[in-house]
C-alpha cells in the first residue's frame, strides 16, 4: 500500500447544476481541492463522471437524453469537453493531467488489465494526475461499471491506493433515509458492509435508502475487500480532501478488514477473469492448497470438467465444496494425459506437473460473489 496514494471519485451529481449540465464552478472547486492534495505530495487519481452532462446540449438535446444512443453520442462529444476543462483547470496549478477511458473488457482481459494498471502507475511516477472515466460511447449495458463507483473501487485496488474517496451530494451513510426521517443518524465509521445493508437500499424509506447509495456501498465493500479503506461523503472548500484523508471528513469512513492488499494477479483472478472449467482434487491436495501454502500438482487431481488451456482460470473443488479458483499452468488435455499415463503404468515415480502455482491461487473467501 502506498500511504500517499488516493483515488477520488466524483459523480455527475457533484458536477452538475439543476438542469443536468456541467457546473463549472463546482468542477473548479473540486480541482482546487485536488490540486491542494497534489501539492501536499499525495499521488492523486481522479475518477470522474460527467461526459454525458458535458455533451448533451451540443447535440441539441433540451435535457439529458434517456436513450442509449443519445447518451453515447452525448458522451462522445462531452468527454472531450470535460477533459479539456479539467486539463485547463489543473494547468492553472502547473499540474499535468491525462485521460484514461476504460471498459469492463479492459479488466476482463489480463494483459489489458496489467497494461492499464502499469499506465496509471507510470503517470503517477511522473507526477501526472490520471483522469479516468468509463468509455460510455462503446460500453454496453451488460458490461458497465455503474456510475463509476465500481470502477473507482477496482482502480483503487489495482494500484494499491491508501484510500478511496467517493464524493457525493450526501454527507455519508445513514441508518435511515435522512430526507424522510428526522431521527436518521449518520454512521461516522463502518467496520463491515453487509449484504443486508446493501439490500436495504432497495426498500423505499428504509435503512440507508438514499438514492444512488447502493452502488456506493457495493463499491466500498469491494474496495475494502481489496485492502482499501473508503470515505463516502462530501466536503466544502479547498482543504476538503486534506480534511478527509486526515480523518476529519463530512461523511462515513469504511474500514478495510484486510491487513494487506491483494496482488493484482489475484485481483484479476477473483474479480475479472472468465471461468473456463473445473478441477476436482483429493484430500491431500486440499491440505496443500488450503493450509500448507502449496501449489496444486497433477497428482492431487481426481477429475476435470471443461476444456481449458494454459493461462485459463478454473474453479477448484474437493469432494465436498468449492475451494477457490486459480490460473492453470497446463491445459486440461495435458493434465488428463498425465494422470491417464500414471494410472495405466501404475507408477508413482512419474513426475507430477504443476497445475496451479500458489501465486495464481485465490481461496473462496477472497472471491467477491456480489461483483460477478
UniProtKB/Swiss-Prot annotation:
Report the CDD domains cross-referenced here.
Answer: AAK_G5K_ProB (cd04242), PUA_G5K (cd21157)
Reactions catalysed according to its record = L-glutamate + ATP = L-glutamyl 5-phosphate + ADP
- Annotated binding of ATP, by residue: 9, 168-169, 210-216
Q: What is its EC number?
A: 2.7.2.11
Domain PUA intervals? 276-360
Which Gene3D superfamilies does this UniProt record tie to the protein?
A: Acetylglutamate kinase-like (3.40.1160.10), PUA domain (2.30.130.10)
Chief subcellular site?
cytoplasm
Cell compartment(s), UniProt: Cytoplasm
**Which keywords does the record carry?**
Amino-acid biosynthesis, ATP-binding, Cytoplasm, Kinase, Nucleotide-binding, Proline biosynthesis, Transferase
> InterPro entries, per this entry?
AceGlu_kinase-like_sf, Asp/Glu/Uridylate_kinase, G5K_ProB, Glu/AcGlu_kinase, Glu_5kinase, Glu_5kinase/COase_Synthase, Glutamate_5-kinase_CS, PUA
Source domain of life is Bacteria
Q: Which GO terms describe its molecular function?
A: ATP binding; glutamate 5-kinase activity; RNA binding
Binding site residues for substrate:
49, 136, 148
Q: Which NCBIfam families match?
A: proB
Q: Report the sequence similarity comment from the record.
A: Belongs to the glutamate 5-kinase family.
Q: How is this protein named in the record?
A: Glutamate 5-kinase
Q: What is the lineage of its organism?
A: Bacteria, Bacillati, Bacillota, Bacilli, Bacillales
Gene name of the record: proB
